[in-house]
Amino acid sequence: MIQMQTNLDVADNSGARRVQCIKVLGGSHRRYASVGDIIVVSVKEAIPRGRVKKGDVRKAVVVRTAKEVRREDGTTIRFDRNAAVILNNQGEPVGTRIFGPVVRELRAKNFMKIISLAPEVL
């Protein structure tokens, strides 16, 4: 469950290390984002010579949440940390690698590039 001011790890090699959610997209009063939702983030920490810089405002998709996600069959899945993948204007990942597992709910939301780059899909 991601809301404004939530800090997230970045699960790709775009150059950002930590981002902060500044807006949840999808409705004028939408408060929370879960796995597969697109948010607007500000880069708070970045590595030198990366594709994104500290202070950049970008869109990102949430790939892991500490709040459990309930599935159709009744099972739940949760992670230790919140994580996101930074997107470009076309909705494709900026980075060329994805670190850590991602959930298969991303497949239903047509993030096939992230699914194919991820080392593990849970």
UniProtKB/Swiss-Prot annotation:
Part of the 50S ribosomal subunit. Forms a cluster with proteins L3 and L19. In the 70S ribosome, L14 and L19 interact and together make contacts with the 16S rRNA in bridges B5 and B8. The keyword Kinase does not apply. This is Large ribosomal subunit protein uL14. PROSITE patterns: RIBOSOMAL_L14. Belongs to the universal ribosomal protein uL14 family. NCBIfam families: rplN_bact (TIGR01067). It holds the Pfam family Ribosomal_L14. Binds to 23S rRNA. Forms part of two intersubunit bridges in the 70S ribosome. InterPro entries: Ribosomal_uL14 (IPR000218), Ribosomal_uL14_bac-type (IPR005745), Ribosomal_uL14_CS (IPR019972), Ribosomal_uL14_sf (IPR036853). The lineage of its organism: Bacteria, Pseudomonadati, Pseudomonadota, Alphaproteobacteria, Rhodobacterales. HAMAP family: Ribosomal_uL14. It comes from the Bacteria. GO terms for cellular component: cytosolic large ribosomal subunit.
